[in-house]
Amino acid sequence: MSFTVYPALDIRNARVVRLLQGDYARETQYGDDVLPRAQAFADAGAQWMHLVDLDAAKAGGYTLAGTLGEIARATGLRVQTGGGVRSREDVARILDAGAARVVIGSLAVRNSEMVVGWLQEFGADRLTIALDTRQDADGIWQLPVHGWTEAADATLDQLAVRYARAGLQHLLCTDIARDGMLSGPNMALYGHLRALTPQLQVQVSGGARNLADVAAAKAAGCAGIVLGKALLEGHLNLDEALAC
């Protein structure tokens, strides 16, 4: 299995931002130079990037189709993107706009039966399921919903197995406690997922801060790692991460 580094840009109000643990009230802005940043990713040798529409994630209705198309045309990057995907039409529109892969998050938790149908319709290589998780007091990995205030009916383990059996290829998993904290990825979580669903290509997300974290994700047999805040704040050099 090859290993992919996904430099990431989260967009809100046409600006590059980062949220702490997904909290919209704890936002750091990094400017509105979206295309130049994407071009810099390509110039460093990246093949892929991860693009998130935070406005749509909150309100629904993907808003970055124009930006996505511009990035894909200008840079040649393959773009994995999501935010606010609520319907089959959303998936089709984002793919038509130039996405290589569409990320489906909360809907994948709320309506797995519908999303499984999309795997068959659009092809498993065109979709990434993104599951945000938090470990409860009993050590169970829950899937918080409704603004991360309640737990879904299914646990992370149950949903990962369900999707794996349905033919899912790409799973992006974020430990909420690590998201945006530069505290290192929770490699125990990813080791657990790899053992539970070895057929899935698991992407590490949340907490990456240095080359050692990239190397650890690769050594654990994960398929890739999403790098956001560490790149934006200069803790990590993309050229070195790509060569790791």
Swiss-Prot record:
Gene Ontology cellular-component terms listed: cytoplasm
Pathway: Amino-acid biosynthesis; L-histidine biosynthesis; L-histidine from 5-phospho-alpha-D-ribose 1-diphosphate: step 4/9
Reaction(s) the record says it catalyses: 1-(5-phospho-beta-D-ribosyl)-5-[(5-phospho-beta-D-ribosylamino)methylideneamino]imidazole-4-carboxamide = 5-[(5-phospho-1-deoxy-D-ribulos-1-ylimino)methylamino]-1-(5-phospho-beta-D-ribosyl)imidazole-4-carboxamide
Subcellular location: Cytoplasm
InterPro entries: Aldolase_TIM (IPR013785), His_biosynth (IPR006062), HisA_bact_arch (IPR006063), Isoase_HisA-like (IPR044524), Isoase_HisA-like_bact (IPR023016), RibuloseP-bd_barrel (IPR011060)
Entry keyword annotation includes Isomerase: yes
Active site as annotated: D10 (proton acceptor), D132 (proton donor)
Signal peptide from the UniProt entry: none
Domain of life: Bacteria
Family recorded in the similarity comment: Belongs to the HisA/HisF family.
NCBIfam families noted in UniProt: 1-(5-phosphoribosyl)-5-[(5-phosphoribosylamino)methylideneamino]imidazole-4-carboxamide isomerase (TIGR00007)
Record PANTHER family: 1-(5-PHOSPHORIBOSYL)-5-[(5-PHOSPHORIBOSYLAMINO)METHYLIDENEAMINO] IMIDAZOLE-4-CARBOXAMIDE ISOMERASE
Protein name (Swiss-Prot/TrEMBL): 1-(5-phosphoribosyl)-5-[(5-phosphoribosylamino)methylideneamino] imidazole-4-carboxamide isomerase
This protein's encoding gene: hisA
